[in-house]
Amino acid sequence: MEQLARLYHDHLRVLNQRVCEILSRENLSGLVIHSGQPHRQFLDDLDYPFKVNPHFKAWLPVIDNPNSWLVVNGTDKPLLIFYRPVDFWHKVADEPNEFWAEHVDIKFLTKADKVAEYLPADIDEWAYIGEHLDVADVLGFARRNPDSVLSYLNYHRATKTEYELACMRKANEIAVTGHQAAKTAFYNGASEFEILQVYLSAISQGENQVPYSSIVALNENSAILHYTALEHTAPAQRRSFLIDAGANFNGYASDITRSYAFEKNIFDDLITAIDNMQLQIINLMQPGVSYAQLHVETHYKLAQILLDFDIVSGDVQGLVEQGITSVFFPHGLGHMLGIQVHDMGGFLGDDKGAHIAVPEAHPFLRCTRELDVNQVLTIEPGVYIIDSLLNELKQDKRQSQINWNTVEVLRPFGGIRIEDNVIVHRDRIENMTRNWGLNR
């Protein structure tokens, strides 16, 4: 924890430098960052699970306390307006005494609607950063989520501080523990629902604490890209298992996927091939490389795998250009990762908001930037038997290039995805996920 505290001090220094630059550029006095506030369910007296403003938790690991505020100007010590109501119905947040608390000034807010008493008097010279524009209106903010400010912050958020990298390594360590437990549960005969409970128990995080809804899919369900339905009964025949699940540490996310076959067969061999391909793509990563080009290169490598396994016929170039590989691999190679699972800034060409478009043939790619030092990204290629996409392909001449017998053999297994979290260094790539022992 002492090391984390030292790294956090430098983390704040970097954030303050960024704020100073954008305030000077935009002629602002500072930023007032709202943690957020509860959302009430329609026609109910219950709130949805609270999700903190990512720009708030970029500064400090307070992720579960709505109605809090952060006042920063890049020069003075950040002011945290910490919400601590008098409330006998709910658990009230403890007074902060963690490693980060000494680095900020703290004032306690007992009534959410009294926050104006703690905000700067010249509020029209400050920008509001947050979700609740109605609150910003009432408080008198003239500038609310300026595009220029958000573009600047989102662009530079891609470059992680050493504190952030330390948090993400820990988030990977935690998630790997859960993945290993989930794998054992699969081979022991657990249902999707039971596997998820094993995973969450192993990482000691609840469904609302993990950074995204975990995907736990058996057999054909593995072909559903964002499958979260969870069957409570184990299938009569156990063939395959895909788990896409992460963990949270100090507000930073890990995002890891693994696929398994219950027996040694063609599907198990295909998992090995995709795993090897994923590692080959990671080896191509270095500063200056276009992430979009890595995605395209993945399609060429996948085309060769499809040929090797007699899933398709033709040649590598033609399979990619005709979009046949996209039928089997319809999503992007991955995305930026940080305080959000899909971290902002993946399409920004500079800190003024220039947009780098996705390749026309690959509309679902989530990152088009060039790689740079201290960026963190996921690499998650896959191959799936998705009936809706294959049915479209059946309607044109490309259907003759599909070995439908092999497709039928693979259909009951669903799909494969292998996902690691990697850091781009100046002279190497750090695979956080594999470094904690989660290999094939």
Curated annotation (Swiss-Prot):
Q: What GO molecular function annotations does the UniProt record carry, in alphabetical order?
A: aminopeptidase activity; metal ion binding; metalloexopeptidase activity; phosphoric triester hydrolase activity; proline dipeptidase activity
Check the record and name the Pfam families matching this protein. Answer: PepQ_N, Peptidase_M24
Q: What InterPro entries does this protein map onto?
A: Creatin/AminoP/Spt16_N (IPR029149), Creatinase/aminopeptidase-like (IPR036005), PepQ_N (IPR048819), Pept_M24 (IPR000994), Peptidase_M24B_aminopep-P_CS (IPR001131), X-Pro_dipept-like (IPR052433), X_Pro_dipept (IPR022846)
UniProt keyword terms in alphabetical order:
Dipeptidase, Hydrolase, Manganese, Metal-binding, Metalloprotease, Protease
The note describing how and how many cofactors are bound reads: Binds 2 manganese ions per subunit.
**Recorded E.C. number(s)?**
3.4.13.9
Catalytic EC class: hydrolase
- Binding residues for Mn(2+) 1, per the UniProt record? 255, 335, 380, 419
Family statement:
Belongs to the peptidase M24B family. Bacterial-type prolidase subfamily.
The protein, known as = Xaa-Pro dipeptidase
